[in-house]
């Protein structure tokens, strides 16, 4: 983790000191706070509610992929042995704990007070689905609302890793019923051409036109990013 701080974030966060962090959780907290405070300065004069959004960071270092999630969203990865895996985070009451609350003491205190009075409404749930091994079974982990959401996966085990906003689960049909999310993920992660902006090309040229033709629309913004790992590079 200390090497990650030095190698990956030295340019963006030049004041980071290696001795300041002994655990990945500490790094997670530092990076989150640094980003939101810099964003607040950059958006001075703009309505601050624009910063109430999920942030997902994925980076590769030392043969591992690290994913830091702040808010709600999805991590999807194709394991070479176990197949497709889906990790989702959700907050009871549809009230994610956004980084922006850390830059506003009043919002932070209000969120903490509400979480103290109604803990069942501010529980973070991390859901694990092994889509290929057992698609109907999931493992739920209940956490406090501010629990660090961190994934660390060896590159050698991966052929693909994707991060996505919760909008990927917002597609509904003409009856206003949610479509099969796992099937949608299988369609998106079925990558034939790996050149250029392959995710954008896949979504804009194939997935979205096909869904629209079937009267299936999304009611929330969809953001997706992905890593594809070369078989030879992974050994």
What are the roles of these predicted feature ranges?
Residues 1, 19-27, 31, 180, ...:
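Short amphipathic alpha-helical segments
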Residues 64-69, 82-90, 233-235:
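Short, well-ordered strand-loop elements centered on a beta-strand within folded domains, enriched
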Residues 73-75, 81-94, 175-187:
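Short, surface-exposed, charged loop/turn segments at secondary-structure junctions
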Residues 116-235:
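C-terminal catalytic subdomain
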